[in-house]
């Protein structure tokens, strides 16, 4: 799997992401600078990692979404390429128009940094095939603006089309206000594009791929991508 990890000023999770990709796929990821206008030849997966691109000025992800490299990412996605955006990466994908909606301040206006539980809503996506449908996984979050919001019609369409892949839940998989850590509409933690090839999610699966972290639940996302690309080749 040939991966490209984007690097913007203020991003700070690119090396975590590159390490996770290397551990699971066995291949080094290419680091692509925000001013580049092309992606490496043969790229299978583009990852927009977490952090605080451009200091979160204007809006989280707003400046990064207008960086030169994002034109190449939009072209890559329109051609069916796989794109993963995590945390600030999710915000950038929304600001870029690759995903609908926006990430707002957490409902309690506090930064959240801890492990959370997610329910995998379906496993017929490249981004979830490493899990079972309905499986509960534990992954970390670290965000102050992870409250996914969209108009009512958009949320209904996302749910009706099966584009909500991950939701915040209890350890037993229950969905409800008490388990919705940031107030996100419909407890949404991750959504995909209409074609299903672009995923944005707030939690950080890249930080739960090694035993030393005490949990490897994030590994399934990357393993599923590797398997998908093998079968698609």
From Swiss-Prot:
Broad class of where this protein is predominantly found: cytoplasm
Name assigned to this protein: Phosphoribosylformylglycinamidine synthase subunit PurQ
Its biological purpose: Part of the phosphoribosylformylglycinamidine synthase complex involved in the purines biosynthetic pathway. Catalyzes the ATP-dependent conversion of formylglycinamide ribonucleotide (FGAR) and glutamine to yield formylglycinamidine ribonucleotide (FGAM) and glutamate. The FGAM synthase complex is composed of three subunits. PurQ produces an ammonia molecule by converting glutamine to glutamate. PurL transfers the ammonia molecule to FGAR to form FGAM in an ATP-dependent manner.
A single Gene Ontology CC term: cytoplasm
Gene name linked to the record: purQ
Entry EC number(s): 6.3.5.3, 3.5.1.2
Active site: 87 (nucleophile), 204, 206
CDD domains named among the record's database cross-references: GATase1_FGAR_AT (cd01740)
Keyword Nucleotide-binding found: yes
Pathway(s) where this gene product acts: Purine metabolism; IMP biosynthesis via de novo pathway; 5-amino-1-(5-phospho-D-ribosyl)imidazole from N(2)-formyl-N(1)-(5-phospho-D-ribosyl)glycinamide: step 1/2
Keyword Ligase assigned: yes
Biological process per Gene Ontology, one example term: 'de novo' IMP biosynthetic process
Catalytic reactions of this protein: N(2)-formyl-N(1)-(5-phospho-beta-D-ribosyl)glycinamide + L-glutamine + ATP + H2O = 2-formamido-N(1)-(5-O-phospho-beta-D-ribosyl)acetamidine + L-glutamate + ADP + phosphate + H(+); L-glutamine + H2O = L-glutamate + NH4(+)
